[in-house]
Design a protein with these regions (language model features):
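Conserved N-proximal alpha/beta basic substrate-recognition cap immediately N-terminal to
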Residues: 4, 15-142
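Redox-cofactor binding/interface segments in oxidoreductases and associated redox assembly factors
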Residues: 9, 87-88, 196
Length: 250
């Protein structure tokens, strides 16, 4: 009898996951369909001892039944070099705990396939990575200099301020010349932030394109609620099936 294939999923507490919006749930269910045994652990459960990386993990099974969508086993220590795949699926913040997890997972990759490559994850924080394509972005500033932020706001009249390493629409604010309050910067704890020109077309939603191995597979529009600027699903954004437009094809 062949040995069961194993996937270890590094993610947030399974109890806190919203099965309606979390794509990791669908990935786990697909892996189950393909015969993989699934183990769940959090970044805090990683241990590196004498060159061996382990995780305090629990066997996990998922089914789409609200309020009763998972079954989880007792904790056990698993050696990550003995599993077939590790999926890095925890949400930001992109802090030292997150970065440390990428360093530890380097110990087993590529003998164990870590998706995505922990080196690439660490070196490509998503908001900074996008600045490699300035022609595809609205005017953008990354800084913690309040005077630079004020000058940028004056240039663009209305701006969006967001934490550089956050997620889910948390900490996003919209300002114009009359509403800007430099005191709001204190909530970012002195860290650099991203400031962008406000694009009024956001009320029509943004689009997420799904690319697999370089091929376009589909897209979804995220629509903000009426009167809101945040289209993030975690912030109440509404999904809507869509397709490519000319700008996307460029």
């Amino acid at each position: 009898m062949s040995q069961s294939k194993k996937i270890a999923v590094q993610m947030d507490p399974i109890e806190s996951i919203d099965i309606k919006t979390d794509s990791t749930i669908l990935m786990i269910m697909e892996a189950q369909e393909r015969g993989y045994s699934i183990y769940h652990y959090q970044p805090k459960d990683l241990t590196l001892k004498n060159g061996t990386l382990t995780a305090r993990a629990r066997a996990l099974s998922i089914h789409l039944e609200e309020s009763n969508h998972f079954k989880i086993g007792d904790s056990e220590i698993i050696k990550l070099y003995e599993v077939d795949v590790v999926l890095m699926r925890q949400d930001p913040p992109f802090d030292m705990s997150y970065i440390t997890a990428t360093h530890l997972l380097e110990q087993v990759h590529p003998k164990t396939l870590v998706v995505n490559n922990p080196i690439s994850v660490r070196n490509s924080p998503e908001k900074i990575f996008t600045t490699l394509f300035p022609d595809l972005m609205p005017p953008t500033l990354i800084t913690r200099d309040s005077e630079a932020i004020r000058a940028f706001r004056d240039e663009n009249k209305e701006v969006i301020i967001k934490p550089l390493y956050g997620n889910g629409g948390v900490g996003i604010h919209r300002f114009n010349k009359n509403s800007f309050n430099p005191e709001i910067l204190k909530q970012y704890l002195g860290l650099p932030i991203m400031v962008q020109e406000y694009i009024k077309e956001i009320t029509q939603g943004d689009r997420r394109l799904i690319i697999i191995d370089g091929d376009y597979c589909g897209s979804v529009a995220r629509l903000p609620k009426e009167g809101e600027i945040k289209a993030n699903f975690h912030a109440g954004g509404i999904p809507n099936k869509t397709d490519l437009v000319f700008r996307d094809k460029e």
